[in-house]
Design a protein with these regions (language model features):
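Perimembrane helix-loop-helix junctions
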Residues: 177-178, 183, 210-241
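Aromatic- and kink-enriched transmembrane "portal" helix at the membrane-lumen/periplasm boundary
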Residues: 49-50, 95-102, 136-163, 199, ...
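Membrane-interface transmembrane helices that cradle and orient dolichyl/undecaprenyl
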Residues: 124-130, 169-191, 198-201, 219-225
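Membrane-interface alpha helices of multi-pass inner-membrane proteins
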Residues: 67-70, 139-141, 186-204, 214-216
């Protein structure tokens, strides 16, 4: 008898009726897998806490640190789920508000690592519970210390919450499949929960919508007759709508006095709401979708460079092995994960965002799931081979020990992927001393005279806002962002400068693309501030 046949299968229901009911209720989540998920979550969180940005950031980071605690309005698409969740989280008595919002990202990505463990366990066909748990744990840690997840875990950003919610959706729909297969009571509840989370996740980031291209086919892979289950379909549709109702935050908040400190696009009307939620400002970023296959080689080169950076060493070779294994053993699951990746990469390749790397988080999660599948298959195959090879030389107990050692060696080798990633990326990813934005804002505020107007652009406006509206610094000054000039009625930077020049001191952090023109149109003098960033200038009458 080989080690493989000696092990108890977690995919086989026990004969005892009472134990069968327990197995149905937990939908095949074994104790070792739960421990592995908890371990991956806690290890990831511990490392994230050691490397977490402690303070304010530039760009979208400071906006994500400012909007929730002040109950303001985000840039398109509004991200109301993040706002509401962030406001609740910002009430925690832990550090400063900026730190709390950064911590929210760390917790979300760490939870995604734990969910990666649970997801992976559903796709592994090996019988040993401990092997499933160990291989799934490797998958979770591989995700935790992949390049983009780790980077996004250290700063406030909607994408960190997105991957946590996306992982939750994937886990719920694959658990629904298992619950259906084993005859768990009320398996549709898992799918209904996924629908609710899907709606809420759309309120965090519409990137969630791409998951429908995989979830739709998955429903019919699991149950070809699901279209007849109209009660379940209606329940899921209703819960999806309930989740989407989070978007009501935007018009409600926009029409409550006093108006929010950050009031992007002033969505007090249907036109303003539509402009914000449907990202009409950014329609130009979608131009590539008119001809998505144009310049495909160049687009793929960029996507490949992002994806290649996520894993270390032979990581992608192991991913390919996992994909091949899953395609042979569970073609439907392979199709589901493949559609998640294809839709994600296709969109990211054609969308021109300032930090497009964040959009590949879900593809990275799927890749790490496949690492776990490959590790389990290799370990299980190795264990069976050793058990067979020692059939004539060892007794049953000896063969089992030898097989276990062989499997453990393979898992240990697979664990080198996250271990090497942790060791080699720690210094690069460490943001624990990053207080650059705070130092810059402090120097700027120190340089501004009483009642000054400062006209800035997005990367710099956001930390200025945080210090003004969250910390209460310099209530005498007016901060005008080069985009929000439109909402404030100035139309252009030039008009805003001329509207205040001679009445109030005017200072400018010129946008990179406007520096030369603005400095040639207006008389200015440089103002000394914290170095290394765009120069602050005073506009002279």
């Amino acid at each position: 008898m080989s080690h493989g046949t000696a092990a108890v299968s977690i995919h086989r229901l026990p004969d005892d009726p009472g134990r069968r009911q327990v197995a149905r209720r937990i939908a095949h989540v074994s104790g070792p897998v739960l421990w592995a998920a908890a371990f991956a979550t806690l290890v990831a969180l511990a490392i994230y806490l050691r490397t977490l940005m402690p303070a304010t950031g530039f760009w979208d980071t400071a906006e994500a640190q400012t909007v929730p605690p002040t109950l303001s309005i985000f840039h398109p698409t509004g991200f109301p789920t993040y706002t509401v969740l962030g406001w609740l989280w910002s009430q925690l008595p832990i550090g400063g508000v900026a730190y709390r919002m950064n911590l929210l990202s760390a917790v979300s990505v760490a939870c995604a690592a734990g969910l990666t463990v649970l997801i992976t366990s559903h796709f592994i066909t090996e019988r040993s519970r401990w092997l499933v748990a160990a291989a799934s744990g490797v998958a979770g840690l591989a995700f935790a210390f992949a390049s983009e997840p780790w980077e996004n875990a250290l700063r406030a950003d909607v994408h960190a919450i997105h991957i946590g919610l996306a992982a939750t959706i994937v886990w719920l729909v694959v658990t629904w499949r298992t619950a259906e297969q084993v005859g768990s009571p009320h398996p549709g509840r898992w799918l209904a929960a996924a629908a609710l989370v899907f709606g809420l996740s759309m309120g965090n980031h519409p990137l969630t919508g791409l998951m429908a291209f995989a979830i739709g086919p998955w429903l019919f892979i699991v149950d070809p007759g699901i279209w007849r289950r109209w009660r379940l379909i209606l329940a899921c549709a209703a819960l999806l709508v309930v989740g989407l109702l989070v978007y009501l935050y935007i018009p409600i908040r926009a029409n409550i006095s006093p108006e929010p400190p950050l009031f992007y696009a002033r969505p007090t009307t249907w036109e303003g709401f539509r402009y914000l939620v449907f990202a009409e400002q950014f329609h130009g970023l979608f131009d590539q979708f008119a001809n998505p296959l144009d310049f495909l080689a160049g687009k793929w080169d960029k996507a490949e460079s992002v994806l290649a950076a996520q894993l270390v060493g032979p990581g992608w070779l192991v991913v390919a092995m996992g994909a091949a294994t899953l395609a042979v053993r569970r073609l439907g699951a392979f199709a589901f994960l493949g559609l998640l990746v294809v839709s994600n990469i296709f969109y990211a390749m054609n969308f021109e965002d300032g930090d497009i790397d964040r959009y590949y988080l879900l593809s990275t999660l799927v890749a790490c799931v496949l690492i776990g599948v490959a590790a389990a298959a290799l370990a299980g195959g190795g264990a069976r081979a050793v058990a067979e090879a020692t059939r004539r030389t060892l007794d049953f107990a000896g063969r089992r020990r030898a097989a276990s050692i062989a499997g453990a060696i393979v898992i240990g080798l697979a664990a080198l992927l996250p271990a090497v990633a942790l060791a080699t990326r720690y210094e690069v990813r460490d943001q624990s001393d990053n207080r650059e934005a705070d130092l810059w804002v402090t120097s700027v505020y120190r340089a501004l005279p009483q009642d000054a107007v400062i006209i800035s652009w997005w990367s710099y406006s956001t930390p200025l806002w945080y210090h003004r509206w969250v910390l209460g610094d310099r209530p005498d000054i007016t901060i005008i962002d080069e985009r929000n000039i439109i909402d404030d009625g100035w139309s252009t930077i030039d008009a805003a400068i001329r509207g205040h020049l001679g009445r109030r001191p005017v200072f400018l952090v010129p946008p990179d693309w406007e520096v030369e023109r603005l400095l040639s149109v207006f008389r200015t003098r440089p103002v000394a501030t914290y170095g290394g960033y765009t120069e602050l200038v005073e506009v002279l009458p």
